[in-house]
């Protein structure tokens, strides 16, 4: 499975592509950071991110895109920009029919380091080790994008099992509802 990991941000948006193999084997194919000037208008910054993501999607043709889920931060401006950048990425993937999954920072940290409260240095060290990289990916946005992709590779089987279980449960609920409705109709 080929996964594009995205650490969204307006100033720096980390992009990565990894390929999963047997077991927990993951190979890094590409990583970069899209930068936009903080003094540029918002629409131009989002367009720059969109253009870069479109290029990556066309070049790498991922099976799925994993994006960091935005959570509450003290700085509303930062969280809004991060959410907007993530939305641009999700839209670009959806336009191509590519599945999008969101992972929280603690999910990513737990998947990569075993500790949902790991710091940036610990995440970077584990990403470097897992991918057998010669040097640590920099800046942190690049390491985070790789960590997101690794997290999704490792969580994808569980996500698929959950989706199948939810579909089966919905089927069973509908079957039960139909049976109750038929019984009520027959009783009238």
Swiss-Prot record:
Its cofactor is Mg(2+). GO terms for biological process: DNA recombination; DNA repair. PANTHER family: CROSSOVER JUNCTION ENDODEOXYRIBONUCLEASE RUVC. Gene3D superfamilies: Ribonuclease H-like superfamily/Ribonuclease H. Homodimer which binds Holliday junction (HJ) DNA. The HJ becomes 2-fold symmetrical on binding to RuvC with unstacked arms; it has a different conformation from HJ DNA in complex with RuvA. In the full resolvosome a probable DNA-RuvA(4)-RuvB(12)-RuvC(2) complex forms which resolves the HJ. Mg(2+) 2 binds at residue 68. This is Crossover junction endodeoxyribonuclease RuvC. It is found in: Cytoplasm. The active site is at residues 7, 68, 141. SUPFAM superfamilies: Ribonuclease H-like. It comes from Mycolicibacterium paratuberculosis (strain ATCC BAA-968 / K-10). The gene is ruvC. Its EC number is 3.1.21.10. Mg(2+) 1 binds at residues 7, 141.
């Amino acid at each position: 499975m080929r996964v594009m990991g995205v650490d969204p941000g307006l100033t720096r948006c980390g992009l990565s592509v990894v390929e999963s193999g047997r077991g927990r084997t993951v190979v890094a194919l590409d990583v970069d950071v899209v930068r936009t000037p903080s003094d540029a208008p918002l629409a131009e910054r989002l367009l720059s991110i969109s253009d870069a993501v479109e290029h990556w999607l066309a070049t790498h043709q991922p099976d799925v895109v994993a994006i960091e889920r935005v959570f509450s931060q003290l700085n509303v401006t930062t969280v809004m920009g991060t959410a907007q950048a993530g939305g641009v990425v999700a839209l670009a993937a959806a336009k191509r029919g590519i599945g999008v999954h969101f992972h929280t920072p603690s999910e990513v940290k737990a998947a990569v380091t075993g500790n949902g409260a790991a710091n940036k240095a610990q995440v970077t060290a584990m990403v470097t080790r897992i991918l057998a990289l010669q040097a640590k990916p920099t800046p942190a946005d690049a390491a985070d994008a790789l960590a997101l992709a690794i997290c999704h590779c490792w969580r994808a089987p569980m996500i698929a099992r959950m989706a199948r279980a939810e579909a089966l449960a919905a089927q069973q609920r509908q079957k039960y509802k139909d049976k109750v409705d038929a019984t009520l109709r027959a009783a009238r």
